[in-house]
Each structure stands twice: as C-alpha cells, then as structure tokens.
Amino acid sequence: MPKIKTVRGAAKRFKKTAGGGFKRKHANLRHILTKKSTKRKRHLRPKGMISKGDLGLVVACLPYA
C-alpha cells in the first residue's frame, strides 16, 4: 500500500493539539486593519480551534498528524 500524501497547505495552517483537536489562525488579520477596532483585532489574535464539522476534512488532509 503506498503512502498517503499530506496536503502541504493544510500542514502549514493547522497544528494538532494533545487532546486530538487542531489549532488554526483566525481570518481577517492580514490587511485593511485601520478600519477594524482594537478590540476586534485583539479577539482575532489568539488561536482558534477547528469545529467538529470540519474536523474530518482536516484529518483527511493530514494523515500522519
């Protein structure tokens, strides 16, 4: 049986946690930041977690994570 390729884009975006979940970065924090409030930017800063509905897709993209 051949090895399964890891989706490299997913490998750069998601990191597996000890509990089996995946960390991800929030969107909307790259550019056009002047019109966004400090509170909004601050809440986007910490890492988020992948939702249960998307977990299967991420696991399929990262077979060895």
Swiss-Prot record:
PROSITE patterns registered for this protein in UniProt: RIBOSOMAL_L35
Keywords: Ribonucleoprotein, Ribosomal protein
Signal peptide from the UniProt entry: none
Domain of life: Bacteria
GO molecular function, one term: structural constituent of ribosome
Gene Ontology CC: cytosolic large ribosomal subunit
SUPFAM superfamilies, per database record: L35p-like (SSF143034)
Residues annotated as transmembrane: none
UniProt record, GO biological process: translation
NCBIfam families: rpmI_bact
Similarity comment: Belongs to the bacterial ribosomal protein bL35 family.
Name of the protein described by the UniProt record: Large ribosomal subunit protein bL35
Organism: Proteus mirabilis (strain HI4320)
Gene from which this protein is expressed: rpmI
